[in-house]
Amino acid sequence: MSDSQEIPYHNQLKNRFRGYFPVIIDVETAGFDAKKDALLELAAITLKMDENGYLHPDQKCHFHIKPFEGANINPESLKFNGIDIHNPLRGAVSELDAITGLFQMVRRGQKDADCQRSIIVAHNAAFDQSFVMAAAERTGVKRNPFHPFGMFDTASLAGLMFGQTVLVKACQAAKIPFDGKQAHSALYDTERTAKLFCYMVNHLKDLGGFPHIASELEQEKTTEKETAL
């Protein structure tokens, strides 16, 4: 169907999250302080909704990033994520290039989905959001598409749905393959988180959750139209 008007109200992405366009994000860093510690890797995946109302991963971007000038580098963090910031094969770009590329991809997806604003989806989302927002502020990139503080945290959602808050455990509960050797790669973790978020949203739909809510909204819209006639 090319005409979105032919697709049921609740099967359109713009109506699923109150006009928000969800974007899966994962970052790898040189510490925990978004203002002082270096952002070293960033990956993002947008989502799309099919005509039956199911979410799927869509576009992706991935950047290795050079530490900003004066950034703090915590050796323990590098040991944890295995990043060698001096390896020329990283192909690292500046924060400016990474944030610009991210925002461009997100704004295109947001426009195509007819959404009003984008929202970060991440595992322990406050951490990832803080680094994205700090980098956006440092670089001065305009037209930030993301809500300044709203977010969807898959750790909280997985805790509610599966009783699991660790990404690998939540993926296992959802029967999503997870290779521990690839963990702490921003792109791999983003891909797993995207699959996890889609699974949880789609599973709720299959259980009769969101369609029930949307049906009430559709009924209200129909009633309003009939009243206006």
From Swiss-Prot:
GO cellular component, one term: cytosol
HAMAP family: RNase_T
Function of the molecule: Trims short 3' overhangs of a variety of RNA species, leaving a one or two nucleotide 3' overhang. Responsible for the end-turnover of tRNA: specifically removes the terminal AMP residue from uncharged tRNA (tRNA-C-C-A). Also appears to be involved in tRNA biosynthesis.
InterPro entries to which the protein is assigned, alphabetical: Exonuclease_RNaseT/DNA_pol3 (IPR013520), RNase_T (IPR005987), RNaseH-like_sf (IPR012337), RNaseH_sf (IPR036397)
Comment on bound cofactor: Binds two Mg(2+) per subunit. The active form of the enzyme binds two Mg(2+) ions in its active site. The first Mg(2+) forms only one salt bridge with the protein.
Organism: Haemophilus influenzae (strain ATCC 51907 / DSM 11121 / KW20 / Rd)
Family: Belongs to the RNase T family.
Keyword hit for Transmembrane helix: no
Site (Important for substrate binding and specificity): 32, 80, 127, 149
EC number, as in UniProt: 3.1.13.-
Binding site for Mg(2+) 1: 26
Domain of life: Bacteria
Phylogenetic lineage: Bacteria, Pseudomonadati, Pseudomonadota, Gammaproteobacteria, Pasteurellales
Gene Ontology biological process: DNA replication proofreading; tRNA processing
Name this polypeptide is given: Ribonuclease T
SUPFAM superfamilies linked: Ribonuclease H-like
Subunit architecture: Homodimer.
One GO MF term: 3'-5' exonuclease activity
Active site: 184 (proton donor/acceptor)
Domain Exonuclease: start-end pairs: 23-197
Cofactor(s) required, per the database record: Mg(2+)
A UniProt-annotated Pfam family: RNase_T
